[in-house]
Amino acid sequence: MKVKVYSTKTCPWCHKVKDFLNDKGIKFEDIDVGANPKAANEMVEKSGQMGVPVTDIDGTVIVGFDKEAIEKALAG
């Protein structure tokens, strides 16, 4: 399973997503879109918006901290 979290350092909801994944023992790639414009463009292409967090779980894109959607995507 490949998990990416597009976030910024100052976003409280981004920290909630990352804490949630860490608590579940899920490894993920943390991508700081504030420091990486190329990654920010990639995030916008996937999600259609500029807001963070955006979580990509094996191609399922979840905008915001949607616990149920994240759990469903993790379950496959």
Model features per residue range: what roles?
Residues 28-39:
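Thiol-based oxidoreductase modules, predominantly thioredoxin-like and allied folds used
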